[in-house]
Structure formats: structure tokens, C-alpha cells
């Protein structure tokens, strides 16, 4: 289950890994029945990048299947509660739910936010305590244009530049993908900063670099919109390049 063997190669001289975990915080745009009335007439908002990360769940599943890794995927719309924000963050709730009574917002946190976060935090804590080093890949996607401005990248890796393990792993994965697809526009810490509030940022506070490497993988949604061969090819290349970065052989 996500356990790799020590091996020679560039990737493992940069980062040794033991346990791979795949998560997806914005995998769907589902609305629980109890809150359906709040979202009446908001289909366009739910379908937009504000409602979910299109393609992130599909990519997350393919990565988890390829490595036999534990997966923690959420399909409730982020407009109900954003699983990639900390409690108290101003964007934890959207304009749809922010004005709800405190008790109802707490109910949302208890039923939809905490189960996802606690499952991930618990799994990583158990393996860290047992001496494993966890590689956590959070699958995300971003809209091709934001406020009318095109985003000039295809794939990006978000990480904390103060953590050597994350720097090395993101670079190894990026270089492995670049070798397979030099035509792709690849960047690091774009279109967001890896140190910003989020699940990986929370986990970094609890685990040292030697025990935890947290990477948010961001893919441009224009591939998802194309569907077909371009999207399938990108997913396959991301899995293959991740395998190389991890230093894992295909016959393990």
C-alpha cells in the first residue's frame, strides 16, 4: 500500500520515500440534500471553478490506482465548505453559506469538513510515528483564465520553499515530466504560493521535513475541457513522471 523500495537513481538521492498518500479536496460539486435550497438557481456557480476542481478527482484516482496508495477524496462542493482552508479562514465558507447561523455552520464543519481532514491527518500521523516518511500529493486543478487573464502554465507544483524535501521532490517530478513532454509549460508555486493556507500547510506544522513532504499538484483545466486524447495523455505522463520521481520500479 504505497510502500516503495530503496533504489539507486537521481530521484532517491534527492528524496527517500516510504508511503504515498493521494488526496483530493475539491473533487466534486455535489450538494447535500439538507442544503439543496441554498444552492437553488446556482447551477452555473456550482459548475464553475469556484464550485469544484474539474478533473482533479479523475487524476487523483489514476495516481492512487497506479501506486496502490491510500486515497482520501471529497466530492461535496467547496461552496458548502472549503476542505483546503483552515478553521477560521475567511474563505472557509463561501458567500452561499457564510451568513448561515453559527450552529448550522458548525454542523457543516462537523459532518463534511472534519471527517475528511481527520482521516488524512490520522493516517499521516500514524505512519510518521512509525518511522515512515510520507509523500502527500493533493490533486487540484485551476481555471485557464482568472479575471479574464490567461494563466501561462499547464502543470504546476505547490510546496514550501523552506522545506528541502519538498523543493527536491517537486523539482524531480517537474524534470521527469519535462523529459517526457518538453512542450508543456511547467512552473512551481504558481498560480498560488505553496506556503499559503491549506491542508499541506497545516500538516507541515505537525510533521518535520524528514517525516512529511506535501505537494499540491495543479493542472490547467483546459486539458479537462478538451477531454479525449490530450487529457488521457497528460494523466498518463503525470503518473509515469511521478513514478520516476519516486524512484519506484514498475515491477514492484
Give the residues covered by each predicted segment.
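N-terminal catalytic or cofactor-binding beta/alpha core of small enzyme domains
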Residues: 2-252
